[in-house]
């Protein structure tokens, strides 16, 4: 069996997109297994995750996102920008659209000005212990690693995120990130961001839950870091977030957070399902 796919990325955070707007292509029970196979960088197409375009009874379209390990997540900031560009380009929705996600219905605007740009109303960041969720108050919680002490702060921007503010990002973030990601404090696990603030510019490196490694960019993480930094009085309400993959612009208001960034459609192709490796 052969199925069509599209390869996209938002600031280097890359995805395989499957269009199920006209009907189911990959059965629900098969989706985790399929995603693990197609996202494998040696035996599949290779990606940080997979996007599924589906019809919605509540909005213009329905967004589904799976991490490369096959787990489904409520939201992905870079993913929803790519998704939105695709559905506008294919004529499934207009340039102002409403998208159903597991994190709620989001409003977006797609613009074509020197490339494709998508502005996402990400909703209001949540800081409550039960909203993150966390077993204890983690606002300023101290973590010790390799003889050093770090303070962590958490927010939920569709998925849980921890921010660790540092003076330098020139170190291997993975060991400490994994310690925090798998801490019993976070019953659902968490994404972990390391951030360096310079005025209203924040440089961020993110370890993503479900990918289980550092990615080139994370949209929900960028929003979370900006919201936490603003709450701590480190930045203003408009912030440039610099990731390894590129720039995201974050704007915070009393009621919501807006994220603006690019969305690239790299190529379209055909998958031969019988050639994928499902045993890895």
UniProtKB/Swiss-Prot annotation:
PROSITE patterns from the UniProt entry: DAP_EPIMERASE (PS01326)
Entries under InterPro entries matching the protein: DAP_epimerase_AS (IPR018510), DAP_epimerase_DapF (IPR001653)
Pfam family, one: DAP_epimerase
Catalyzed reactions per annotation: (2S,6S)-2,6-diaminopimelate = meso-2,6-diaminopimelate
Entry's EC annotation: 5.1.1.7
Main localization (coarse): cytoplasm
Gene Ontology cellular component annotations, sorted alphabetically: cytosol
Pathway: Amino-acid biosynthesis; L-lysine biosynthesis via DAP pathway; DL-2,6-diaminopimelate from LL-2,6-diaminopimelate: step 1/1
Site feature Could be important to modulate the pK values of the two catalytic cysteine residues, where: 161, 208
Active site: 76 (proton donor), 218 (proton acceptor)
Keywords of this entry: Amino-acid biosynthesis, Cytoplasm, Isomerase, Lysine biosynthesis
SUPFAM superfamilies: Diaminopimelate epimerase-like
Binding site for substrate: 13, 67, 77-78, 191, 208-209, 219-220
Gene Ontology molecular-function annotations: diaminopimelate epimerase activity
GO biological process, alphabetically ordered: lysine biosynthetic process via diaminopimelate
Keyword Protein biosynthesis in record: no
Intracellular or extracellular location(s): Cytoplasm
Known role: Catalyzes the stereoinversion of LL-2,6-diaminopimelate (L,L-DAP) to meso-diaminopimelate (meso-DAP), a precursor of L-lysine.
Subunit structure: Homodimer.
Family indicated by similarity: Belongs to the diaminopimelate epimerase family.
Name listed for the protein in its UniProt record: Diaminopimelate epimerase
Organism of provenance: Archaeoglobus fulgidus (strain ATCC 49558 / DSM 4304 / JCM 9628 / NBRC 100126 / VC-16)
UniProt lineage: Archaea, Methanobacteriati, Methanobacteriota, Archaeoglobi, Archaeoglobales
Gene: dapF
């Amino acid at each position: 069996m052969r199925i069509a796919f599209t390869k996209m990325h938002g600031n280097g955070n890359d995805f395989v997109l499957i269009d199920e707007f006209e009907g189911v292509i990959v059965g629900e029970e098969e989706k985790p297994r399929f995603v693990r196979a197609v996202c494998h960088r040696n035996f599949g197409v290779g990606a940080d995750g997979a996007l599924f375009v589906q019809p919605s009874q509540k909005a213009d379209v329905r967004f589904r996102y799976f991490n490369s390990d096959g787990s489904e997540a409520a939201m992905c900031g870079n993913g929803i920008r790519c998704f939105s560009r695709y559905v506008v380009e294919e004529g499934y929705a207009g340039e102002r659209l409403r998208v159903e996600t597991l994190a709620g219905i989001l409003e977006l605007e797609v613009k074509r000005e020197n490339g494709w740009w998508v502005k996402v109303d990400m909703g209001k960041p949540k800081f409550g212990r039960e909203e993150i969720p966390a077993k204890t108050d983690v606002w300023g919680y101290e973590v010790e690693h390799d003889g050093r002490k770090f303070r962590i702060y958490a927010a939920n921007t569709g998925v849980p995120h921890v921010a660790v503010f540092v003076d330098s990002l020139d170190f291997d973030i993975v060991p400490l990130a994994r310690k925090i990601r798998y801490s019993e404090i976070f019953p659902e696990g968490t994404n972990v961001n390391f951030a360096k603030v310079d005025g209203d510019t924040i440089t961020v490196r993110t370890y993503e839950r479900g990918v289980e490694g550092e990615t080139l960019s994370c949209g929900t993480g960028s929003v979370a870091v900006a919201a936490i930094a603003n709450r701590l009085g480190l930045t203003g309400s408009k912030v440039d977030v610099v990731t390894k993959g590129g720039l995201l612009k974050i704007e915070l208001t009393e009621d919501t957070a807006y994220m603006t960034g690019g969305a690239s459609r790299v190529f379209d192709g055909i998958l031969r399902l019988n050639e994928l490796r499902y045993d890895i």
